[in-house]
């Protein structure tokens, strides 16, 4: 990767921080406002420069179409972030049998630090650029806030959704207008928060 200019590094850090706080990248207008650019077009130029340097991918047609790009290393040894595949009911998500491989990704690239990668299945979060086959970087925690994108386990299913809670009621909200929210009553249903989404990685070689 070519070195980033100070301004490009600032834009990249803002993208990471926004994903940490809200679970999604910022819009061009938000970047311009937070960094003092005169217009969203100025933010777009910095994003294009980051894309040319291989740091992000710009997805056309969506205001939040920004995705981190990393290259896969050959998994010659079991180091790096574990990639979680299908999760068996009742087993810890990081159980050895769930780990498909490891990626040579620096956990400190994300904030909070990523603890594992989860292969995304389906298009329920497509509106914020989380697509089928993507690798979701996850910080393992049960402490999450309303509005954050989480990895949740409900009965036998592991799902990626936006978290909303009021009292004993939890809503797992999709970012796809064709799908309905999942409503959970904690007084009679078991819901486990496996972690907080802290970034999305797309590897074209895996697609």
Swiss-Prot record:
Site (Cleavage): 89-90
Enzyme class, spelled out: hydrolase
EC number: 3.4.21.88
DNA-binding region: 28-48
Catalytic activity: Hydrolysis of Ala-|-Gly bond in repressor LexA
Organism: Aeromonas hydrophila subsp. hydrophila (strain ATCC 7966 / DSM 30187 / BCRC 13018 / CCUG 14551 / JCM 1027 / KCTC 2358 / NCIMB 9240 / NCTC 8049)
Family in the record: Belongs to the peptidase S24 family.
Name of the protein: LexA repressor
Cross-referenced InterPro entries: LexA (IPR006200), LexA-like (IPR039418), LexA/Signal_pep-like_sf (IPR036286), LexA_DNA-bd_dom (IPR006199), LexA_repressor (IPR050077), Peptidase_S24_LexA (IPR006197), Peptidase_S24_S26A/B/C (IPR015927), WH-like_DNA-bd_sf (IPR036388)
GO biological process: DNA repair; DNA replication; negative regulation of DNA-templated transcription; proteolysis; SOS response
């Amino acid at each position: 990767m070519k070195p980033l200019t100070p301004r490009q590094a600032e834009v990249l850090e803002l993208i990471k921080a926004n994903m940490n706080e809200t679970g999604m990248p910022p819009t061009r207008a938000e970047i311009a406002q937070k960094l003092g650019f005169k217009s969203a077009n100025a933010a777009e130029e910095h994003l294009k420069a980051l894309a040319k340097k291989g740091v992000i991918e710009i997805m056309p047609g969506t205001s939040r179409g920004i995705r981190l790009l990393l290259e896969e290393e050959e998994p010659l040894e079991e180091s790096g972030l574990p990639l979680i595949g299908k999760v068996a009911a009742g087993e810890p998500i990081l159980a050895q049998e769930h780990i498909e491989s490891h990626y040579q990704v620096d956990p400190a690239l994300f904030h909070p630090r990523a603890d594992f990668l989860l292969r995304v299945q389906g298009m329920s979060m497509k509106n914020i650029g989380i697509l089928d086959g993507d690798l979701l970087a996850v910080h393992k925690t049960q402490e999450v806030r309303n509005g954050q994108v989480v990895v949740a386990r409900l009965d036998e299913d592991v799902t990626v959704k936006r978290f909303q809670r009021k009292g004993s009621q939890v809503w797992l909200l999709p970012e796809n207008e064709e799908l309905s929210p999942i409503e959970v009553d904690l007084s009679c249903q078991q819901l486990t928060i496996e972690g907080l989404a802290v970034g999305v990685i797309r590897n074209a070689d895996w697609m």
